[in-house]
C-alpha cells in the first residue's frame, strides 16, 4: 500500500472536536486502513474501546495489522452501515466517525477498478467483494434511460445523456469489461475543454458507477437514521463527505435533528482542509466535515 493511503483526511480537525471531552468509547464505521483510528488511539489514552467496521475485507486486514499496538483497545467487524443499523448496539459511544466515499487504498489498488488510471484491469468497484454486482455488470445490463439517471443523479455529469447513449452503442459490438473499455466507449463524449480542467472528464462517471454499485445513497440513509441512537449523551457524530450528493443529505439531516431537539450542530460552517493539507494530500481537496452533538438528556 502506498504511503498516501496512510494519510487520514482532516485528522487534526477530528481530534480537536473531542479535545474538551476525551472519548472513552468510539465507533468508526469506515475503518479503512486505520488512519483515523491510529490517530485517535494514540492521542486519547482514555479511549479504551474503539469499535471499527468496514465493508472492505482487504481494508480490515490492513487495519488489523496497522493497529496491532492497540489490540487490547480496538475491535474489528466486517459490516456495512445497513448491517450496523440492523444489529443491536453493543454500547453507547462518545464518538462516531464516518469517512464517506472511496479510500486512497481502494483507488491505488488498480485491480479493484475504482480508478480510471488503470487499463486492462476489470471494471469492478465493489467495496464489499462478497457482493455480486460490479460496475461492468451495470454498464452491460442496464437500459439507456437508467444509465442516464445514474450518471445524472449520482455523478451530476453534464453529458449524462450522451454518455448513456455511448455506452449502449459500444456494448452492441463489445462487452464493457475493463477500464480501457470504458475509456474507449466514453472519452469521445466529452467536449475538449473538459480535458484541460483539473478534474478528469471520467471522474464523475466513475463516481456515479461507484455510488450505484455500492448502494452508497441507501447506505448513507441507514447511517443517518441510526447513528444518533448509537451516541451517549453529548456524544458527537462526525461525517466527512467528498461530493455534494453526500454532503447535502448530511447537512439537512443535522439541521432537522437539531430542530427536533435531538442535539445541536457543532459545525455551523463546514470544515474543509487547509491549504497545507491539500498540498500534502491532494485527494483531500473536496473533503467536508460536519459534526453533530447529541443532547445531554
Curated annotation (Swiss-Prot):
Disulphide connectivity of cysteines: none
Location relative to the cell: Cytoplasm
Pfam families named among the record's database cross-references: Methyltransf_5 (PF01795)
Keyword terms, alphabetized: Cytoplasm, Methyltransferase, rRNA processing, S-adenosyl-L-methionine, Transferase
Catalytic activity: cytidine(1402) in 16S rRNA + S-adenosyl-L-methionine = N(4)-methylcytidine(1402) in 16S rRNA + S-adenosyl-L-homocysteine + H(+)
Residues holding S-adenosyl-L-methionine: 34-36, 54, 81, 99, 106
GO MF: rRNA (cytosine-N4-)-methyltransferase activity
Any one GO BP annotation for this protein: rRNA base methylation
A GO-annotated cellular component: cytoplasm
The EC number(s) this enzyme carries: 2.1.1.199
Main localization category: cytoplasm
Keyword rRNA processing: yes
Organism domain of life: Bacteria
Role according to the record: Specifically methylates the N4 position of cytidine in position 1402 (C1402) of 16S rRNA.
Stated family: Belongs to the methyltransferase superfamily. RsmH family.
Database matches in PANTHER family: 12S RRNA N4-METHYLCYTIDINE METHYLTRANSFERASE, S-ADENOSYL-METHYLTRANSFERASE MRAW
Protein name: Ribosomal RNA small subunit methyltransferase H
UniProt organism field: Chlamydia pneumoniae (Chlamydophila pneumoniae)
Gene that produces this protein: rsmH
